[in-house]
């Protein structure tokens, strides 16, 4: 037997009637026609919305205050570290300046070595005067520049000396004095090279005068001799009807040209010697400036010497005190040994005779 299917709008499952929905509201007529065991549904309850001014919140004032305190402590830490950072920056700047001066000193030393090699040459035909003059001028300018840079470095140390520690200031002054001593040594070497160059120029001049003295002394006699020869040649030419060749003008022009070359060479050497003398004078002024700078460092060196002497006296006093303490400890040790021996003797007597 096939069951009968009932079709409904919502309360069906594949055409099978399931019954009334629990949420279905029955009308009064339908309620009266239903069985008596089904209870009527309660009336719908109206939902009351919450008041608009009421909302959930949490007091986070303490968290805000703690965040402010942490930020303030960070700022205070940064401000406390600012002097240290400033000192490190100043130290790096001083190091860079000293490094640059040392590099310039090494470059100038290399140029001075090249000038020394050129200045010690004594040959008349291998004299590179132009290159020597250029190197002399360049080295002189470098020495003046290095002198100014060292003075600026010393002024920097003086300006920042109050902000740095005593040991750091002493170290900086030591570096400045070392650079000054290197510059003074290089200036002294440069002065020695210029003096050698001056002596070589004097020797070359004396040699040139020695080799060119005979032609110059025979120069006044040349026109008369050449004139007599010209007259004889003129008489012979007039007698024979040939053309006379006068050699007076050509020889005179050659001798005059030789004299002009000698004069120009002597003048160039005189100018070179004057330049060398002026350079030596400038080096003397640089030595005076270096002496003044070293004199200013004399107080620091004397203070260091006094500190060394004081430290030596303190070490000697500490050594004497240590010796006294050692003697006292040694005497106390013997006293303790005596007491220990006495106790052992009493213990032996007590054990042997009284036991």
Swiss-Prot record:
Any GO CC annotation of this UniProt entry: cytosol
Record region (Disordered): 28-47
Chain ranges of the t-SNARE coiled-coil homology domain: 263-325
Similarity comment: family membership: Belongs to the syntaxin family.
Keyword match Membrane: yes
Cytoplasmic side: 1-333
Coiled-coil residue spans: 287-318
Subunit structure: Part of a ternary complex containing STX5A, NSFL1C and VCP. Part of a unique SNARE complex composed of the Golgi SNAREs GOSR1, GOSR2 and YKT6. This complex also includes VTI1A. Component of a SNARE complex consisting of STX5, YKT6, GOSR1 and BET1L. Interacts with BET1L. Interacts with BET1. Interacts with COG4. Interacts with GM130/GOLGA2. Interacts (via IxM motif) with SEC24C and SEC24D; mediates STX5 packaging into COPII-coated vesicles. Interacts with VLDLR; this interaction mediates VLDLR translocation from the endoplasmic reticulum to the plasma membrane.
Record field: compositional bias (Polar residues): 28-37
Stretches assigned to the Vesicular side: 355
Location (main, coarse): endoplasmic reticulum
Membrane topology of this protein: Single-pass type IV membrane protein
Residue window of motif IxM motif: 245-247
Record flagged with keyword Transport: yes
Keywords, in A-Z order: Coiled coil, Golgi apparatus, Membrane, Transmembrane, Transmembrane helix, Transport
One Gene Ontology MF term: SNARE binding
Protein name as it appears in the record: Syntaxin-5
Subcellular location as annotated: Endoplasmic reticulum-Golgi intermediate compartment membrane; Golgi apparatus membrane
Transmembrane segments: 334-354
Annotated Gene3D superfamilies: 1.20.58.70
InterPro entries, per database record: SNARE, Syntaxin, Syntaxin-5_N, Syntaxin/epimorphin_CS, T_SNARE_dom
Function: Mediates endoplasmic reticulum to Golgi transport. Together with p115/USO1 and GM130/GOLGA2, involved in vesicle tethering and fusion at the cis-Golgi membrane to maintain the stacked and inter-connected structure of the Golgi apparatus.
Source taxon at top rank: Eukaryota
């Amino acid at each position: 037997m096939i069951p009968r299917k009932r079709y409904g709008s919502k309360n069906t499952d594949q055409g099978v009637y399931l019954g009334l929905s629990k949420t279905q509201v029955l009308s009064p007529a339908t309620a009266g026609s239903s069985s008596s065991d089904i209870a009527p549904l309660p009336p719908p309850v109206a939902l009351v919305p919450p008041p608009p001014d009421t909302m959930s919140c949490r007091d986070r004032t303490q968290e805000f205050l703690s965040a402010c305190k942490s930020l303030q402590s960070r700022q205070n830490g940064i401000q406390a570290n600012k002097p240290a950072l400033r000192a490190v920056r100043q130290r790096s700047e001083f190091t860079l300046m000293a490094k640059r001066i040392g590099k310039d000193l090494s470059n100038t030393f290399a140029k001075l070595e090249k000038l020394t090699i050129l200045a010690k040459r004594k040959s008349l035909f291998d004299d590179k005067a132009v290159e020597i003059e250029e190197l002399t001028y360049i080295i002189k300018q470098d020495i003046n520049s290095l002198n100014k840079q060292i003075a600026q470095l010393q002024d920097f140390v003086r300006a920042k000396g109050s902000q740095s520690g005593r040991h750091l200031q002493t170290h900086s002054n030591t570096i400045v004095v070392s650079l000054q001593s290197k510059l003074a040594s290089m200036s002294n070497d440069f002065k020695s090279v210029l003096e050698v160059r001056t002596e070589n120029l004097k020797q070359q001049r004396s040699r040139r005068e020695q080799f060119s003295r005979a032609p110059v002394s025979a120069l006044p006699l040349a026109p008369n001799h050449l004139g007599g020869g010209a007259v004889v040649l003129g008489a012979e030419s007039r007698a024979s009807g040939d053309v006379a060749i006068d050699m007076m003008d050509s020889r005179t022009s050659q001798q005059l040209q030789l004299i002009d070359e000698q004069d120009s060479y002597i003048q160039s050497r005189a100018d070179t010697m004057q330049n060398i003398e002026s350079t030596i004078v400038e080096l003397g002024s640089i030595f005076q400036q270096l002496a003044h700078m070293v004199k200013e460092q004399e107080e620091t060196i004397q203070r260091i010497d006094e500190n060394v002497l004081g430290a030596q006296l303190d070490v000697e006093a500490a050594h004497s005190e240590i010796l006294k303490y050692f003697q006292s400890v040694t005497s106390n040790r013997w006293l303790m040994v005596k007491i220990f021996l006495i106790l052992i003797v009493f213990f032996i007597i007590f054990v042997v005779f009284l036991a």
